[in-house]
């Protein structure tokens, strides 16, 4: 059922992907995204208007810096299902420990059947740890567990934060194979648009991209190291709320105003 891309020397896809996010109640959020293809050298879903991320999520804050979130719906990378996240954060925010478990099926628009949804769920689960070093603004992440298609692996990331910019390297070992690469997230113009009383319309806040050193062999044939996102705007900068980091830039901003 995977949309084959092995007969292409290179691939490209340009889409317009508007999304609506709506707060329903305390901690509850509805997200709906539709993908409009503009140009692509692929086929199947890449040539059709199709649903993007469509989810309903509930976040809960427990005592002692413990947070939980459950999300259900249609995710990125053609996965549909549910995911549960739990996270513990120290008072100063420099250490985070977490875990997640998800159960998803394959979901895609195909030429022969329209919207196809598989009947065999796949389970993915991870343990995570994150450490922030305030003097150099470096964030170190380590996670290990089971990916979507059954391979077990470990991934480590090192990310440097520059204001609203985030640039990092990663290394991945899964299914007996080594991979690595880099990633970045940069802010886009138009982030500070004025809010209407009821809603606001604005472009994406960030452009995020990840480069993988190895994208052939088992990483294609066996779909190793595959994961998904539960939000259309997930990146390593927009959800980075480290207290020391925020305090540092608030002080710098105040110093500029007083000069």
Predicted regions and their residues:
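Surface-exposed loop and membrane-interface regions of Gram-negative outer-membrane beta-barrel proteins
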Residues: 38-54
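Hydrophobic alpha-helical bundles in membrane proteins
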Residues: 36, 54-71
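Membrane-embedded beta-strand positions of outer-membrane beta-barrel proteins
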Residues: 30-34, 68-70, 97-101, 129, ...
